[in-house]
Swiss-Prot record:
Keywords from the named record: Cytoplasm, Kinase, Phosphoprotein, Phosphotransferase system, Sugar transport, Transferase, Transport
Top-level taxon of the source organism: Bacteria
GO CC entries: cytoplasm; plasma membrane
Residue ranges of every copy of the PTS EIIA type-2 domain listed in the record: 2-142
Protein's name according to its UniProt entry: Multiphosphoryl transfer protein
Species the sequence originates in: Salmonella typhi
Subcellular location: Cytoplasm
Swiss-Prot/TrEMBL domain comment: The PTS EIIA type-2 domain is phosphorylated by phospho-HPr on a histidyl residue. Then, it transfers the phosphoryl group to the PTS EIIB type-2 domain. In contrast to classical PTS systems, the fructose-specific PTS has no requirement for HPr; FruB combines a IIA domain with a HPr domain.
Primary role: The phosphoenolpyruvate-dependent sugar phosphotransferase system (sugar PTS), a major carbohydrate active transport system, catalyzes the phosphorylation of incoming sugar substrates concomitantly with their translocation across the cell membrane. The enzyme II FruAB PTS system is involved in fructose transport.
Domain HPr stretches: 285-375
PANTHER family listed in its UniProt record: MANNITOL PERMEASE IIC COMPONENT, MULTIPHOSPHORYL TRANSFER PROTEIN
Region (M domain): 156-284
SUPFAM superfamilies: HPr-like (SSF55594), Phoshotransferase/anion transport protein (SSF55804)
Length: 376
């Protein structure tokens, strides 16, 4: 995780246009010892290739691969423009984060930033902040409540089990490892019997020891019998705010519609989608998987190409990094796509729902195969 100093943050700046803003940011990077004088040319050239506007009033100007030799050390300079700077057609940036990084160092930094900035409320606060200290706290996530923890790290599938205790222990351990619960929660959820929701689904929680909101799921390879009742999957909930309620509602909808069997046969990505996305509950969803071959993964430029391809269609489209957290993201949001942390060789699953879903998936596959603007 990169560290951000208040000396690298410049609130209340004012410029006439995007080029002026980029030159000002490049000068700050040079003064801080991050880049040599020629880096500004790469920053301006990058904007000619594709806009570095992420969305939510945020831009991330940075150089091209041709000017990586101008980078002396990795760093950022943050400029806030309260009156806004036109960054492209229909794009107004209120915060520009100038990035200097050689190789693919900037990808980790970018992923950290986008996880914070993808929160719409944080982006709004960045516009109105008045001090460097306040901006730093927002960018480092210090003012952001922790998001619900429900991803590949809190799921255990295909467990050889013949009793609920095995699943209880696995879920409790996952939540403890995630820092979501304390020892009291672990003891309570292992010792107390879970609740039978029906259709092979069981649920447990604890009123004690909830440190952050999280959900753990464990599933047996084969269903087993518990006092005459079917058991195959256990959901354990740690609740520190209202975030888990949406997951429980989706779980309830699956049970009410007698579709809980989907949870018992789905792979990890589909199971996560069923619990975190309302679209996954419908029957008319198409999906396709593609492997990203771009040398540096989905950074801003290929990410923009992917999002622009998706925006050509009316269907609702989500994208899941099967080699990442496994959680689906809105395919129309560059911020959320970049935050997926896609590297070369990662598998992406796209789901599309709508009248042109089939055409959309084909176009996405063709774009990825063609290299998303960086060559196949």
């Amino acid at each position: 995780m990169f560290q951000l100093s208040v000396q690298d943050i410049h609130p209340g700046e004012q410029v006439g246009n995007k080029e002026e803003a980029i030159r000002q940011i490049a000068a700050a990077l040079a003064q801080a010892g991050n880049v040599a004088g020629g880096y500004v040319d790469g920053m301006l050239a990058r904007e000619q290739q594709t806009s570095t506007f992420l969305g939510n009033g945020i831009a991330i100007p940075h150089g091209t691969t041709d000017t990586r030799d101008q980078v002396l050390k990795t760093g950022v300079q943050v400029f806030q423009f309260p009156q806004g700077v036109t960054w492209g057609e229909g794009q107004v940036a209120y915060v520009a984060i100038g990035i200097a990084a050689s190789s693919d160092e900037h990808l980790g930094l970018l992923r950290q930033l986008t996880h914070v900035l993808s929160d719409d409320s944080v982006a709004e606060q960045l516009k109105s902040a008045t001090t460097a200290e306040e901006l730093r706290a927002l960018l480092m996530g210090e003012k952001q409540s922790e998001q619900l923890k429900l991803d590949n790290e809190t799921m255990t599938l295909d467990v050889i089990a013949s009793s609920l205790v095995t699943l209880q222990a696995l879920n409790a351990a996952r939540l403890k490892e995630a820092g979501a619960v304390d020892a009291a929660f672990v003891a309570k959820t292992i010792n107390d019997s879970p609740m039978n929701l029906g259709q092979g689904i069981w649920l447990n929680d604890s009123a004690e020891g909830n440190l952050r909101s999280a959900v753990a799921v464990s599933r047996a390879t084969q269903a087993f019998d518990v006092e005459g009742e079917k058991a195959a999957l256990l959901v354990t909930v740690a609740m520190n705010d209202e975030q888990p309620i949406a997951v429980l509602k989706r779980l309830g909808d699956l049970l009410l519609n007698n579709k809980a069997d989907r949870l018992l046969s789905a792979d990890a990505a589909t199971l996560l989608a069923l619990l975190t996305s309302d679209d996954a509950l419908t029957d008319d969803v198409l999906s396709a998987e593609f492997v990203v071959r771009n040398e540096h993964g989905l950074h801003a430029r290929p990410g923009t190409m992917l999002v622009n391809t998706i925006k050509q269609f009316n269907s609702e489209i989500t994208v899941t990094n099967l080699d990442g957290t496994g959680k689906p993201a809105n395919g129309r949001s560059l911020m959320k796509v970049v935050a997926l942390g896609v590297k070369k060789g990662h598998r992406l699953r796209f789901t599309a729902q709508g009248e042109d879903a089939e055409q959309a998936l084909k176009a996405i596959g063709d774009a990825i195969a063609a290299g998303l603007g960086e060559g196949a």
